[in-house]
Regions:
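Short, surface-exposed patches at the edges or C-terminal ends of soluble domains, predominantly
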Residues: 1-406
Length: 406
């Protein structure tokens, strides 16, 4: 593998230079070649039509290559809340992904289901999929007799209408035949997607009508009981998040309950609510966060995985919104990382090539509503009163000593 470093003499970025030297030192199969655009002005034209900035890279192996622009290494993203830009360094992730791409003969195939009002994938998640070197295609079950054989995984993302019974059978057969299914679907304004969630019934999982509301203040964020901070169970999908103390956020979620063993496979809960959670039957029409007579008691699973006895696999996230850029940012990227871990496990990439970019700004601190209230009381009330009390004691002590001296 050859990494061409496109840079003018004296304009080398120290961080990129240090990173490239580590790649070259740690592997005898990687060679770094510096190309000065002043000396070789047309060199990059055979690889890309883009404008090539200083400190851009080209990774090549045989007849495959990938261009890495400077703005793919130092990533700037607009922050609509602070009207500023967040900058992160993604050199390691971009280079490792490019090396994986140029040395791979076949890339995983992800097929996205369409035809049910599915939302467009958020830009951040799409970029992560591209970085993982997974090729994405769209398809409709209405125009095929079965799921394409070349599909390594089928993704159903944020549908707004239900699938038909015939489509349900096709997807069920796909999993029974060893297929892999990734679903991100929460409640809709019309209610529960009965046929879609019916795929889980064969494995002893039932969906509860309505929207999950969390009554335990340690388990929801931003003073919004429908924005859940669920508990994470250890698994290949969640272990990396648990180790680094990241917490996914699940907004507007469908509640799922394991009703018993079906004999068709093994179900593993990934994210669960507290025992105090309940599902509001009113769904999107709810007028109060208080529990009412017909509401359904928790706890619920809001993310789970299924390993079918046939070899098929399902990973199910019961929220259509958790990958939206806003919630992903509030979770400091934990939502996107968990989804990518799930996708990587399904397509057979046990060691995900997607490496977290290093933020040059800051991450959001996600805390529960009760912790937020406690901090407010401490900062606004307790600490000022404490310092006031100490000050009064000091003044009285000094006056007492002065009086005794007199």
């Amino acid at each position: 593998v050859t990494i061409y470093w496109i840079v003018q003499s004296g304009k080398e970025d120290d961080i990129i230079e240090n990173l490239l030297s580590k790649y070259e030192t740690l592997s005898g199969h990687i060679k770094v070649v510096k190309k000065n655009p002043d000396v070789f002005p047309t060199f990059t034209e055979q690889y890309t039509n883009e404008t090539v900035q200083n400190n851009s890279l080209i990774v090549e192996c045989g007849d495959r290559s990938r261009f890495i622009g400077y703005d793919d290494i130092y990533i700037q993203e607009a922050d609509v809340y602070s009207y500023s830009y967040n900058t992160s360094f993604d050199g390691e992730g971009a280079i490792t992904s490019a090396i994986d791409y140029v040395v791979s003969e076949e890339l995983p195939q992800l097929y996205m289901l369409e035809g049910h009002g599915e939302a467009e994938l958020p830009a951040t998640f799409s970029e992560q999929i591209e970085k993982e070197n997974i090729e994405v295609s769209s398809f409709s079950l209405l125009t095929v007799d079965s799921v394409p054989e070349e599909a390594d995984c089928v993704l159903i993302y944020a549908p707004t209408s239900d699938i038909s019974e015939e489509e349900q059978k096709m997807l069920a057969n796909y999993v029974t035949d060893g297929g892999k299914l990734l679903v991100m679907a929460g409640p809709t304004e019309e209610g529960t997607l009965k046929n879609l969630y019916g795929l889980l019934e064969a494995y002893g999982v039932e969906a509860s009508d309505g929207v999950v509301i969390e009554a335990d203040r340690e388990h929801y964020a931003f003073q919004a009981p429908y924005v859940l901070l669920p508990d994470m169970a250890g698994s290949d999908i969640t272990d990396s998040l648990i180790e680094e103390n990241y917490f996914p956020i699940m907004p507007i979620s469908q509640g799922m309950k394991i009703t018993g063993s079906s004999g068709n496979g093994t179900v593993t809960e990934l994210l669960t609510t507290s025992d105090a959670a309940f599902s509001k039957i009113a769904g999107y029409s709810l007028s109060t966060y208080e529990k009412e007579e017909d509401d359904i008691d928790g706890p619920f699973s809001v993310a789970l995985s299924v390993e079918a006895n046939s070899g098929g696999k399902i990973v199910w996230f019961a929220s259509s919104s958790f990958l939206e850029d806003m919630y992903n940012a509030y979770s400091s990227g934990a939502n996107g990382d968990m989804a990518m871990n799930a996708l990587s496990s399904l397509v057979g990439e046990s060691e995900a090539m997607a490496i977290r970019s290093k933020s040059l700004n800051y991450n959001y601190l996600t805390i529960s509503a009760s912790t937020s209230s406690l901090l407010k009381v401490m900062m606004i009330g307790v600490f000022p009163l404490l310092y006031l009390g100490i000050g009064i004691c000091v003044v009285l002590t000094r006056r007492k000593k002065q009086n005794e001296t007199v």
